[in-house]
């Protein structure tokens, strides 16, 4: 291909439309359209400067100049949406590329190859700058304004130039503002956080202070914007440095993109008035939610915000002063409300209303029987005109707490209520009297004093208890805390407050009698217990098999031989083992009884001094009341004793058989042994 040589040889010669469209240079220029690369770059989230750069220092003074700060906010707001500079550039190049074709259709008034090559070089330079920028083509060089072709036929290029001039003037006007104040003015949207609660709280706090000066502020905005637009000077030759723009995006993208709410971003079509209104929403310098408290804690925290570029208004906000004035106003209003309440509402009714909810007050009202408190009736068919309606019986009207249906016990039906009361009183004069009547107010129905209940009060109708003995809550007398009276028809009354058939003295006497009877029963039981113990001891002292008792007529027992006779008792006492038997047979009372062991030990002494030691009771006749019922006594027969000169103890029978008696175990005696 030798197209470059042809283009060089044909420089300065006019060419036709068909030859120019077929030239490779025209095709190459059309392929280098800047619209596609510029529109594919403006996504700010694809760069990692937000993640890898450290946040700026908070407590140190701002390091960037005022122009850098203002440009930083301007660039960041437009980076997420459509960049105004990129749009201007794209419109410029697009208008250039589109206007060349109709110009060639008109045989292009003096257009040559040098103009096309110059335009190609400018497009390449602009593309390289946009690609080399780390912020996605946001650093547009404003020096491209002179290269924009101006055509007045359709006005498209002139409109683009005016838009670019307005944007540049806006940037230049922002650079003239002070450092800290302009940072606050353009950082108004930084205080719109993702959290709706935080934004709402901050908005409520600031709108109280700024609501008064909002009207004056807008009036100043309208006046100053007109003067500011008339005093503008075109400074399109100045350009923003590349390093400054890159630093702007590094420093501000971290705060705006993460904390800014969508829909509240500035666009390139906003005018100066809208910008002034948006910046006037926040006039307080702020660092962050967690550092605002440190900034506001200073005593003399005042900020002078001067907005020269938009309205040249001077707003002075004192945080501590505004808070103190707000607190003073609140205290003043509270004091006024208290004074009004003290003057209008008396103290005693208020205290009574507060005391209505206390249980003691309710209890006193219920006990007093006065119809002051409504008991919240629940009538459905009686229309609250019967005695079982507690409100009607108490003489009060039904109020809101009552859940009655079709109620006539209200002030609007006063005539019906009074007529019903008179009709009921004509039949029973005490119908509407209190249930519990005190002694001072009670009237004796009979002349006897005994008819009066000894308790402090009595029930007007009385109870009708049958099985509860007036000791349960459904007894009206017991429930009212009064004793039963003669009017009561109860049975087996045991009312603790007073019985209907007696006085309190009788009740005390009955209680004393009950106590005495209980004591007597206790003593009787103790005596019975002692007697039982004594009987047990006596029964244990007697032998298990008592021997038969001999009477005087039985002293001479019949024997087989009439010659043999029983020896006298003196001879019997001298015997060995048999003497114990007869001795035990003669014992009649426990106080003179002797144990068998002791008798066995003193056999010899008894034999010697038998006549002297014999008790008199043994000589006399025995007691005939004791009878022998032991079968052993019937079988045992006394042995035949033969008198012998030797005085032998053992006797012999005729048959030569000996009587062998087993030893009887000894039993303890009841009397002490000496």
From Swiss-Prot:
Ubiquitous but expressed mostly in all the aerial organs with highest expression in flowers. The keyword Nucleus applies. Its main location: nucleus. Coiled coil: none annotated. Keywords: Developmental protein, Metal-binding, Nucleus, Zinc. Residues 507-516 have a biased composition (Acidic residues). Residues 95-109 have a biased composition (Basic and acidic residues). It is found in: Nucleus. Residues 1-16, 76-89 have a biased composition (Polar residues). The cysteine-rich domain CRC binds zinc in vitro. Belongs to the lin-54 family. This is Protein tesmin/TSO1-like CXC 2. It comes from Arabidopsis thaliana. The gene is TCX2.
């Amino acid at each position: 291909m030798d197209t470059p040589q042809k283009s060089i040889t044909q420089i300065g010669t006019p060419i036709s439309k068909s030859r120019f469209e077929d030239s490779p240079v025209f095709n190459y220029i059309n392929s280098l359209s800047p619209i596609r690369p510029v529109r594919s770059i403006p996504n700010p989230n694809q760069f990692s400067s937000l993640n890898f750069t450290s946040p700026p220092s908070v407590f140190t003074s701002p390091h960037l100049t005022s122009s850098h700060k203002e440009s930083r906010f301007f660039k960041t707001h437009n980076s997420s949406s459509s960049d105004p500079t990129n749009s201007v550039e794209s419109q410029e190049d697009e208008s250039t590329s589109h206007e060349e074709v109709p110009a060639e259709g008109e045989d292009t008034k003096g257009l040559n190859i040098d103009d096309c090559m110059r335009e190609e070089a400018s497009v390449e330079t602009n593309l390289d700058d946009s690609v080399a920028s780390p912020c996605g083509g946001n650093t547009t060089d404003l020096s491209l304004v002179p290269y924009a072709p101006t055509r007045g036929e359709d006005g498209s290029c002139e409109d683009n130039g005016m838009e670019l001039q307005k944007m540049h003037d806006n940037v230049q006007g922002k650079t003239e503002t002070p450092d800290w104040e302009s940072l606050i003015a353009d950082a108004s949207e930084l205080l719109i956080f993702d959290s709706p609660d935080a934004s709402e709280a901050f908005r409520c706090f600031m709108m109280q202070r700024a609501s008064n000066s909002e009207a004056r502020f807008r009036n100043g905005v309208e006046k100053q914007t007109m003067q500011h637009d008339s005093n503008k000077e075109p400074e399109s030759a100045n350009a923003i440095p590349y390093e400054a723009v890159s630093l702007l995006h590094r420093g501000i993208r971290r705060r705006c993109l993460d904390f800014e709410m969508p829909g509240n971003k500035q666009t390139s079509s906003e005018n100066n008035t809208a910008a002034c209104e948006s910046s006037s929403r926040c006039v307080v310098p702020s660092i962050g939610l967690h550092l605002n408290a440190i900034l506001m804690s200073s005593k003399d925290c005042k900020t002078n915000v001067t907005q020269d570029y938009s309205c040249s208004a001077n707003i002075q906000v004192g945080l501590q002063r505004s808070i103190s004035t707000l607190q003073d106003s609140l205290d003043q209003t509270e004091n006024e409300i208290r004074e009004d309440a003290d003057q209008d509402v008396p103290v005693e009714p208020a205290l009574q209303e507060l005391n209505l909810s206390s249980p003691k007050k309710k209890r006193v009202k219920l006990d007093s029987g006065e119809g002051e408190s409504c008991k919240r009736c629940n009538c459905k068919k009686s229309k609250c005109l019967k005695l079982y309606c507690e409100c009607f019986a108490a003489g009060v009207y039904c109020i809101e707490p009552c859940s009655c249906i079709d109620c006539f016990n209200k002030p609007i039906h006063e005539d019906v209520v009074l007529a019903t009361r008179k009709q009921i009183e004509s039949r029973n004069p005490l119908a509407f009297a209190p249930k519990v009547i005190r002694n001072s107010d009670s009237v004796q129905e009979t002349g006897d004093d005994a008819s009066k209940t000894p308790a402090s009060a009595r029930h007007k109708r009385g109870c009708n208890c049958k099985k509860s003995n007036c000791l349960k809550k459904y007894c009206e007398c017991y429930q009212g805390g009064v004793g039963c009276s003669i009017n009561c028809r109860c049975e087996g009354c045991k009312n603790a407050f007073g019985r209907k058939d007696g006085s309190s003295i009788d009740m005390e006497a009955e209680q004393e009698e009950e106590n005495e009877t209980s004591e007597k029963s206790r003593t009787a039981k103790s005596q019975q217990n002692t007697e039982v113990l004594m009987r047990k001891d006596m029964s244990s002292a007697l032998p298990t098999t008592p021997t038969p008792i001999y009477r005087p007529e039985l002293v001479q027992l019949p024997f087989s031989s009439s010659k043999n006779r029983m020896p006298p008792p003196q001879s019997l006492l001298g015997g060995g083992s048999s003497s114990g038997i007869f001795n035990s047979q003669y014992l009649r009372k426990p106080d003179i009884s002797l144990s068998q062991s002791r008798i066995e030990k003193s056999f010899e002494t008894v034999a010697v001094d038998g006549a002297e030691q014999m008790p008199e009771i043994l000589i006399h006749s025995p007691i005939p009341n004791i009878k022998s019922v032991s079968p052993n006594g019937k079988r045992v027969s006394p042995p035949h004793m033969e008198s012998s000169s030797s005085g032998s103890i053992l006797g012999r029978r005729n048959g030569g058989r000996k009587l062998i008696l087993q030893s009887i175990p000894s039993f303890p005696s009841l009397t002490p042994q000496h």
